[in-house]
Amino acid sequence: MKIALIGYGKMGHAVEKIALERGHSIVCHIDQGEEALMDTPEFRSADVAIEFTTPATAVDNYRRCLAAGVPLVSGTTGWLSRRAEVEKMVADSGLAMFWTSNFSIGVSLF
């Protein structure tokens, strides 16, 4: 699977390590200030984007992923006041989004 990582902190590094160990490839890393990379062919080639950022940037990241045609998994918390907006955005895109607030078990099972 080709994965784009959005947010390259502790969780991003952990996901990358496990993904590579399992034979997946990381097509791009996007960290704070590098959001324009979501407009690149490398990003659009991803099978999925895995996003761990901040509440202030998460919804815009979701929008950019969906606009690029990339389904996403997010572990970012603190944006639920905008849940209806995000649900509509995902439904309108025809793509998928998976969100959970606790990846401690998820990372172990990845």
Where are these regions (language model features)?
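Rossmann-fold NAD(P)-binding glycine/threonine-rich loop
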Residues: 63, 76-100, 108-110
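Short, acidic/turn-prone active-site loops that include or flank metal/cofactor-
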Residues: 32-35, 77-80, 103
